[in-house]
């Protein structure tokens, strides 16, 4: 009898460190974890690779797949659509790895309605000021985009305070401490599955 591997969802505002934590996890444990690559209609940032960081696609193509029921969640942010296909998750699970997903709170609400039984972890920035500093430090966003991301962050933080929204919350005020906490949570959850 094979053990069902439950996906792990990291959620939180843009700039809270989700991608960095996921990269650390999949680099340290490449045979244990696989990243579910989301689709997006936004343009790639410098150093992002199609098929590795995101599947960069058109609005028409992503909408067709969503309408065909091929996605477990999707959301629109700053005029761009993002989503996770069933295939992306199942491709990782088929390798025998635990699937790691990077999904916003809209997506978390959708994924809770599926049969995936995900471990939901909220990555919280130490403060909105620090989050703004991180977003500005990227140097990839317009002022308007930064303001939209900060507005979205407030909504994400509000949702995270609702009872039952997430199983765990990690404050990412120190990357190494946050990463250690993430590994401890996943280790405990995996042993209970």
Predicted segments, located by residue:
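ATP-dependent small-molecule kinase phosphotransfer cores
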Residues: 38-99, 106
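Post-Walker A helix-loop "phosphate-sensing" segment adjacent to the P-loop in P-loop NTPases
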Residues: 26-35
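Small-molecule kinase domains that catalyze NTP-dependent phosphoryl transfer to phosphate-bearing small molecules
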Residues: 140-188
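Conserved phosphate-donor/acceptor-positioning beta-strand/loop module used by diverse small-molecule
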Residues: 99-104, 113-137, 171
């Amino acid at each position: 009898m094979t053990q069902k591997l439950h996906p792990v969802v990291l959620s939180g505002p843009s700039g809270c460190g989700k991608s960095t934590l996921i990269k650390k996890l999949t680099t340290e444990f490449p045979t244990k974890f696989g990243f579910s690559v989301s689709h997006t209609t936004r343009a790639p940032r410098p150093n992002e690779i199609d098929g590795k960081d995101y599947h960069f696609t058109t609005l028409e193509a992503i909408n067709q797949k969503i309408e065909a029921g091929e996605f477990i969640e999707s959301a629109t942010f700053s005029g761009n659509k993002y989503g996770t296909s069933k295939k992306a998750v199942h491709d990782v699970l088929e390798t025998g790895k635990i699937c790691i997903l990077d999904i916003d709170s809209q997506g978390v609400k959708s994924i809770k309605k599926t049969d995936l039984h995900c471990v939901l972890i909220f990555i919280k920035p130490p403060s909105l000021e620090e989050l703004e500093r991180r977003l500005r430090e990227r140097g990839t966003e317009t002022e308007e985009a930064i303001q939209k991301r900060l507005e979205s962050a407030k909504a994400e933080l509000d949702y995270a305070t609702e009872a039952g929204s997430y199983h765990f919350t990690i404050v990412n005020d120190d990357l190494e401490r946050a990463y250690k906490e993430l590994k401890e949570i996943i280790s405990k959850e995996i042993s209970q599955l």
